[in-house]
């Protein structure tokens, strides 16, 4: 439990000259225990905790429940190989459902425990109205998001339980295969068209998410999976943390044709701060300037319209520009966007307005 002095300091309204930011993706629930950090204390490692969120105007976002493979089985560092033009990461093997369920419940419990111990400074939100209320009152709005659905069996029983616990967003896969779909492998340069699409169980999962009002996230799906989801849902298509393949030809980014489909559905792309998905050379270089983020925002705004662009930082899950640093550096990005000519109303849409619209249309209310 955080002390009284800590909570008093966190309750102060920050003098951030920009609208509060709702962010499409972070991995804080994974990194907090791995780095022995408290969400209530300003850390020297990682990107996101409550003090840094307040300082940077981070008003909330999708908090990923992600289960990594055991390191003895697979690690990204060991799986990566470099080519003359870029890199390729050997796909992670499938994850055992029993392990995934235990780890998923642990991470979901961690988020609910943070909510309880925050004494009203963070809320696990279940409706768009709750998100909007939190942003207006300065309460951090946390959406429980499942990144890879290995914890859910093909009968989908676990989905109902997780929904009751607060789950409102789900990516059928991370970048590995499971019973529902095939994740896009990490490769540069490369096409996201890397294999088959949704399985029959995956199609059932998407339909059930539609019935419940759970947002389906497309960011780690391969291209055929993307189009399968597009053909199954009337909801806005959302890629919570992806960029433009035309600017950075990594497999994790979206082609122009995919971007057009997101636009036509009324959906949204959350611009990812991961430098390897920003740079035209795909290098994982923390010295990458913040202007690489604005470059993708500019391209997406021109291609799909500003109403379909948001932010999807990947805080605590990727190398981001050193100039940005962590969540406390978000005003530097907003200032860079203002210098690019974005108006106050456009900055509000980028910061949270577009996300709010999509959440209303997907969840109702």
Label each PLM-derived region with a short phrase.
Residues 2-192, 249-311, 315-365:
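N-terminal hydrophobic targeting/anchoring segments and the immediately downstream early-domain regions
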Residues 151-153, 162-252:
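Divalent metal-binding pocket/active-site signature
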């Amino acid at each position: 439990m955080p002390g009284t002095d800590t909570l008093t300091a966190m309750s102060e309204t920050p003098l951030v000259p920009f609208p509060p930011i709702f962010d499409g993706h972070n991995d804080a629930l994974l990194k907090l225990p791995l780095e022995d950090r408290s969400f209530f204390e300003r850390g020297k490692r990682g990107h996101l905790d409550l003090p840094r969120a307040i300082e940077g105007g981070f008003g909330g976002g999708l908090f990923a429940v992600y289960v990594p493979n055991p390191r003895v089985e697979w690690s990204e560092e060991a799986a990566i190989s470099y080519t003359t033009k870029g890199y390729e990461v050997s796909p992670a093997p499938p994850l055992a459902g029993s392990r995934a369920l235990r780890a998923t419940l642990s991470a979901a419990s961690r988020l609910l425990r943070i909510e309880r111990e925050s004494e009203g400074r963070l809320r696990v939100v279940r409706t768009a109205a709750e998100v909007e209320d939190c942003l207006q009152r300065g309460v951090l709005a946390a959406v429980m998001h499942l990144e890879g659905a290995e914890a859910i069996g093909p009968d989908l029983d676990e989905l109902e339980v997780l929904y009751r616990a607060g789950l409102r967003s789900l990516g059928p896969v991370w970048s590995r295969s499971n019973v529902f779909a095939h994740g896009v492998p990490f490769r540069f340069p490369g096409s996201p068209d890397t294999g088959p699409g949704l399985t029959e169980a995956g199609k059932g999962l998407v339909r059930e998410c539609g019935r419940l009002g759970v947002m389906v996230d497309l960011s780690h799906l391969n291209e055929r999976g993307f189009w399968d989801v597009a053909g199954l849902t009337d909801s806005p298509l959302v890629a919570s943390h992806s960029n433009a393949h035309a600017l950075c030809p990594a497999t994790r980014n979206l082609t122009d044709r995919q971007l057009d489909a997101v636009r036509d559905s009324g959906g949204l792309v959350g611009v990812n701060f991961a430098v390897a998905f920003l740079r035209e050379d795909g290098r994982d270089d923390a010295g990458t300037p913040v202007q690489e983020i604005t470059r993708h925002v500019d391209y997406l705004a021109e291609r799909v319209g500003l109403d379909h662009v948001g932010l999807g930082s990947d805080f605590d899950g990727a190398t981001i520009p050193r100039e940005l640093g962590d969540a406390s550096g978000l005003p530097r990005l907003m200032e860079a966007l203002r210098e690019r000519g974005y108006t106050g109303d456009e900055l509000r849409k980028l910061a949270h307005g577009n996300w709010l619209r999509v959440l209303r249309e997907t969840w109702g209310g």
